[in-house]
């Protein structure tokens, strides 16, 4: 609004100055013909008109000065804007040049990339062709390998060998063997030791089962004897206690009569004093217990607080480390931001300095133009004064000529003034339009600068928001990290506890394993001895079974100590006899089968001989080429028959092997279950071990001593595990407890016995 008012005032001043200039032009016109009668009136008019004219001239000169100043300002603005326009044009030219360079670079890069792409496509095509060729080759090799695998599968149906076949094949080197022969050899090498082991394990299992049954029977007998002895011992102990109590009661009754009479008063006073002491001690005890409870509670609370404080200290240490890391990171960021801020401040100071320099230049130019204007004004005023003085003189001299000239030239002057006024108005309008255009440009530039400033402010706000968001994310991550650290510590503690438990369990298990291994080694040594004895007996019996004469068989048996006290069982003898009977039956079956095979083979031989005769007769009758074909067909038929028979036999063998394998697996699983059951019955085995040791050490003694000593040892072991028996009961020697003289009444059972007596 202030700018608009100043513009309007300037317009008014300019118009007034132009009007005054027109008037001054009218007054300056000289007059030649003036009458003498109007001289006095003309003097008065001339003086007024001169004053007005001088004022108008002064105003016009002021307006001219202002107009010159404004023109100078406009010229300066034009120069500034022209320089800015030139700079912008230079920037535009630079940008266009850069654009052209970038387009050229882009075209070059596109050309290079197209060349590279074409080369890469060619390489890919070549690689694809090579890959396809390789794929075809691999497919062909795959088909060949599949055919070979099919042949190998067909050949690998029957790979079970006898010992003779294995020995024959083993004699050949591995390179000369075919794949099915090599596989059958390897299968025999792997399966044969397993079969032997299974047989041995079955034998061991049977032996252990027999021993277990015998040990169980012995254990039952020993437990029965132990229970009987324990019952007898408890009855004797109860009787002894009753007798000791009766003796103590009788002694008390004897001594009470004399003692009460002599020391009744002393005992009563002592009792009262002791009762008072007991009451005081109880009070003190209650007070101390209460204080002890309070102290224990305080101690537990303090221990809890100490634990919590230790946890807080550890957490604070970790927080401190984390905060130190964050502080270091933030300090680095702060240093970067400070460097950036210093750069921006330096740029801002440079811009301020440039602004101040421009302002100083503007002020200096304004002062310079002001001084020049004042000097010009002073010179013009002096010139005006001189002119006014000269004109006054001229007016005094030519006052008469004034009115005539004025009257003559008034109309012409008016016309000229109007024309000049119109010209001035047009010039003013042009100047105002240019001024408005410049103002519009100035405003546009100002708006563009303001928009840029707002954009920069908006960017700074966005960056501040992003920094706040990053800080929030950092805080959340810090919280999550602390929680994770706490969980880690908990899991570490749990892991330490579990590792301690694991090590303790491992140590206990190792101890137990060593004990069991020692026991197992002892049992194994004994079992080996028994097995050797039984094997010797089996060999002797088998030798006697092979001998046909009974007398010679009895001699062999007696020579090896038959009839002596060899530690064998009835079950073992039954097994041996059953084994011999089975062998006899097997031999009979084999004999009958061999006879049947012989008869069948004889029949086959007769049939084949007949067929051979017929075929030979036919062949002799036929011509040569047909004979050759028939022989080839016969050979093929014979080969086919032999191959089919061998295939059938091999399939049967495979099925038998599968059955044997399943049976062996079942026996293996059963043995594993039996072993687990035996391991579960460790306590029974330990007791059996002790019994066997005692039996071995005291084998020469009588059976009565064994029955007495063994329950003692068993009872001692069980007492050491379960009960803590006092020393008075050791070695069946009872030492009664010391008698205590009390003022209590006798028990009821002693009173009843007294009443009965």
UniProtKB/Swiss-Prot annotation:
Which intervals of the chain are annotated as region Disordered? 712-757
Region ranges (Required for interaction with PCM1): 271-363
Conditions for induction: By progesterone.
Biased region (Basic and acidic residues) positions are 742-751
Expressed in which tissues: Expressed at highest levels in testis. Moderate expression is detected in spleen, thymus, prostate, ovary, small intestine, and colon. Expressed in the first trimester pregnancy decidua. Localized to extravillous cytotrophoblast (at protein level). Also found in syncytiotrophoblast and part of the villous cytotrophoblast. Isoform 1 is expressed in first trimester and term villous trophoblast; trophoblast cells can additionally express other isoforms. Overexpressed in solid tumors from stomach and uterus and in cells from ovary, cervical, breast, lymphoma and leukemia cancer.
GO CC annotation terms, alphabetical:
centriolar satellite; centrosome; ciliary basal body; cytoplasm; extracellular space; microtubule organizing center; nucleus
Region: Sufficient for NK inhibitory function; residue ranges are 1-184
Q: Where does the source fall among the domains of life? A: Eukaryota
Q: Where in the cell is it found?
A: Cytoplasm, Cytoskeleton, Microtubule organizing center, Centrosome; Cytoplasm; Secreted
Outcome, altering residue 637 to A: In JBTS33; loss of function in ciliogenesis
> Which terms does the UniProt entry file under GO BP?
activation of Janus kinase activity; cilium assembly; immune system process; mitotic metaphase chromosome alignment; mitotic spindle assembly; negative regulation of interleukin-12 production; negative regulation of natural killer cell activation; negative regulation of prostaglandin biosynthetic process
Keywords of this entry: Ciliopathy, Cytoplasm, Cytoskeleton, Disease variant, Immunity, Joubert syndrome, Nucleus, Secreted
Region of interest: Mediates modulation of Th2 dominant cytokine production: 1-419
GO molecular function terms listed in the Swiss-Prot or TrEMBL record:
interleukin-4 receptor binding
The disorder on record is: May be associated with microcephaly.
Function in brief: Plays a role in ciliogenesis.
- Subunit relationships: Isoform 1 interacts with PCM1, BBS4 and CEP63. Interacts with IL4R. Interacts with CFAP53.
User: Which PANTHER family does the entry mention?
Assistant: PROGESTERONE-INDUCED BLOCKING FACTOR 1 (PTHR18950), PROGESTERONE-INDUCED-BLOCKING FACTOR 1 (PTHR18950:SF1)
Other notes on this protein?
Answer: During normal pregnancy, the production is continuously increasing until the 37th gestational week and is followed by a sharp decrease after the 41st week of gestation. In pathological pregnancies, urinary levels fail to increase. Candidate for the diagnosis of threatened premature pregnancy termination.
What protein name does the entry list?
Progesterone-induced-blocking factor 1
Taxonomic classification: Eukaryota, Metazoa, Chordata, Craniata, Vertebrata
